[in-house]
């Protein structure tokens, strides 16, 4: 992925998958909705898409086998349908499953919520999986990149942000770092984002809260943007991706790229 152009990465938030509490028994409709969103993102001009088991609340720390298999099927369908770079995130913190799926479907990157350190979450205490993931990458070598959160959203963190950031990169071996607001759709703290950019030897990606209104300000400090909530119909995360809203954000990004040349 070309971080020189500050890519827009659009979220494909999946409906509840088999193996999750809210699954309604209709897997075909899950796949169809995911493909519609992925195609819309490609048509709008997004630079990449990322698929995530967003609907699987309440999340376990690690996904069960049914969920992993189902997510792989959806990811492969998206891989076959669109030509954009593809990412995988398995909530709440199953980077091993995410990498395995990405390897199987030839995806390009994964997101890991807690690669290093400890997060206090609604799933309990989640510990980093950097060692386990590094060993899997060694066994299954590929070009798949690891995007790792620092002080991930929907969690409480007691350590220093700068220390956690550097640990994630230097000891966790993240290929890029993700900085988010406190929750899905909530904007990132610009001061924290600026600090991340100042100290980071790897790309810094905004992981939540990017909108048409704040993109110009965030553009100064970020190398990429994971966008979900704002590009949905009416700006509501549970809705489908809106072609109009997604195109509007893409056009703004084009203007910002041009102005920075």
From Swiss-Prot:
<dbReference type="InterPro" id="IPR005137">
    <property type="entry name" value="BtpA"/>
</dbReference>
<dbReference type="Pfam" id="PF03437">
    <property type="entry name" value="BtpA"/>
</dbReference>
<protein>
    <recommendedName>
        <fullName>Uncharacterized protein TK2179</fullName>
    </recommendedName>
</protein>
<comment type="similarity">
    <text>Belongs to the BtpA family.</text>
</comment>
<dbReference type="InterPro" id="IPR011060">
    <property type="entry name" value="RibuloseP-bd_barrel"/>
</dbReference>
